[in-house]
């Protein structure tokens, strides 16, 4: 068998998530169906580096799969790209070692979360940015977001009941910028891994701080007490993008 690593992007609006679902459309299943057709009906299994939720988008998701033959990488990329649904784009494909695993090989991820604070909202962006039409103090959020950088136990920012035992993660970058129109905010988070709904919970908390309904120091309290009830609401998924996955050499 020959193992390939692919970088893909997708519009998450019409997907129930990346991971295969029993009764709903998923990115994994669509790519597996295309690869199985290319492999003359023999089943191909796709593995993903990240499991994005329903409605979450990806600019740089990484997958791997095995084929029973070797094929020119660009020809394979072109075939997989053109025969996959239009809301999936295959950016690149490369041959990798047989023991490479996109999920378990050491890597870091970067996510972006886009907020539309326009009044009225931009209807063309309704599936691609989370609308928040309330007053926001950007400077307060920029101070608060920096408190998330570093190595912390992020129990207070993960979904209640998550099965992961070790909730310590390292965030190497946490930043917030505003576009030139002032309408769109982009939150960026880079780190060695993120817990279930962690980013959406962090953004929901930061928006509450920006709206002056929480103090900036609430971030410190959430990290110290590890209590989800102290954090803000979970932001909607439509503003979240898996931007990039970087592997160590």
From Swiss-Prot:
The record, for CDD domains, names:
PseudoU_synth_EcTruA
Query: What is the catalytic activity of this protein?
Result: uridine(38/39/40) in tRNA = pseudouridine(38/39/40) in tRNA
Q: Which UniProt keywords apply?
A: Isomerase, tRNA processing
Q: Which GO terms describe its biological process?
A: tRNA pseudouridine synthesis
Where's the active site on this chain?
53
Q: Which residues bind substrate?
A: 111
Q: What is its EC number?
A: 5.4.99.12
GO molecular function terms noted in the UniProt entry: pseudouridine synthase activity; RNA binding; tRNA pseudouridine(38-40) synthase activity
Q: Which family does it belong to?
A: Belongs to the tRNA pseudouridine synthase TruA family.
Query: What is said about its interaction partners and assembly?
Result: Homodimer.
Record function comment: Formation of pseudouridine at positions 38, 39 and 40 in the anticodon stem and loop of transfer RNAs.
User: NCBIfam families per the record?
Assistant: hisT_truA (TIGR00071)
Name by which UniProt lists this protein: tRNA pseudouridine synthase A
Name the lineage: Bacteria, Bacillati, Bacillota, Bacilli, Lactobacillales
Gene name, per UniProt, is: truA
């Amino acid at each position: 068998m020959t193992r390939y690593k692919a970088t893909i992007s997708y519009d998450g609006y019409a997907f129930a998530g990346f991971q295969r679902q029993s009764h709903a459309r998923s990115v994994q299943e669509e790519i597996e169906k295309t690869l199985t057709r290319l492999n003359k009906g023999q089943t191909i299994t796709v593995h993903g580096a990240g499991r994005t939720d329903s409605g979450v988008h990806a600019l740089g998701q990484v997958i791997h799969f095995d084929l029973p033959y070797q094929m020119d990488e660009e020809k394979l990329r072109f075939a997989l790209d053109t025969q996959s649904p239009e809301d999936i784009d295959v950016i690149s494909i490369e041959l990798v070692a047989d023991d490479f695993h996109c999920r378990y090989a050491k890597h870091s991820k970067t996510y972006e979360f886009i907020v539309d604070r326009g009044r009225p909202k931009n209807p063309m962006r309704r599936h691609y940015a989370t609308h928040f039409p309330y007053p926001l103090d950007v400077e307060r959020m920029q101070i608060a977001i920096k408190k998330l950088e570093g190595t912390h136990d992020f129990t207070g920012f993960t979904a209640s009941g998550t099965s992961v035992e070790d909730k310590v993660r390292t965030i190497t970058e946490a930043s917030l910028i505003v576009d030139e129109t002032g309408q769109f905010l982009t939150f960026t988070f880079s780190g060695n891994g993120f817990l279930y709904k962690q980013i959406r919970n962090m953004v929901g908390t930061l928006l509450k701080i920006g709206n002056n309904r929480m103090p900036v120091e609430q971030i410190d309290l959430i990290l110290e007490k590890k209590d989800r009830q102290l954090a803000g609401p979970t932001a909607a998924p439509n503003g979240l993008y898996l931007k990039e996955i970087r592997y160590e050499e």
